[in-house]
Regions:
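Phosphate- and other anionic-substrate recognition elements at nucleic-acid/protein interfaces
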Residues: 1-191
Length: 191
């Protein structure tokens, strides 16, 4: 896998702020070799940042299934040429609309299955531990780890008016570490 070009993606999938990190390469995993795609309902984030981060507005929807389908269609359009994708698993401590989250994710998994795209599920605690060293890391800790690793302060760049790290910054960071974890796992398995 070290010298072979591959296209992989890490998906932080949700109803309110889905984000996909696409990496194409055969060597070291770097931020510059990634492209990020996210959906937002905030117009000022629906644009490109730094040349490799691309935000789009959510599509209009009237019923839940229409919403799930539009998000999954958006994702599959980006993921069609991937050799492998990794999806963050469910947070079993989650509260609220957990069945909506499961239905939404189920639509994506089904569409990826139809496309023949292999999916690996990574538990949220593994993503957090891989990114920050702590399996219970919060958004601030993940952002701090990302800045330390990449030298890029996405919060200051994209959401300078927000007090805390939130969407879309936290979604981009999570998708980055989901993709990087899969890249690392693929390299290890090829040894």
């Amino acid at each position: 896998m070290n010298h072979m070009m591959h296209k992989i993606a890490g998906i932080d999938y949700s109803l309110c702020g889905p984000c996909i990190c696409v990496f194409e390469g055969g060597g070291r995993f770097t931020f510059d070799d990634c492209c990020f795609y996210f959906l937002t309902d905030t117009k000022k984030y629906a644009k490109s940042f730094m040349g490799n981060i691309h935000g789009e507005m959510f599509s209009e929807w009237n019923v839940d299934m229409e919403r799930y389908q539009s998000i999954a269609d958006w994702a599959v359009d980006i993921l069609k040429e991937m050799h492998q994708v990794s999806l963050e698993g469910y947070a079993y401590s989650a509260t609220g609309k957990v069945f909506h989250i499961a239905e939404n994710t189920g639509v994506l998994k089904y569409k990826l299955f139809q496309e023949g795209i292999p999916v690996t599920i990574i538990p949220p605690t593994e993503v957090k531990k891989f990114g920050s060293g702590k399996g219970n890391a919060d958004k601030q800790m993940m952002h701090h780890a990302f800045v330390k690793e990449t030298g890029i302060d996405l919060k200051s760049l994209m959401t300078p008016d927000k007090k805390d790290v939130g969407s879309p910054v936290s979604d981009i960071i999570d998708s980055y570490y989901i993709c990087k974890k899969m890249h690392t796992d693929l390299l290890v398995s090829s040894l």
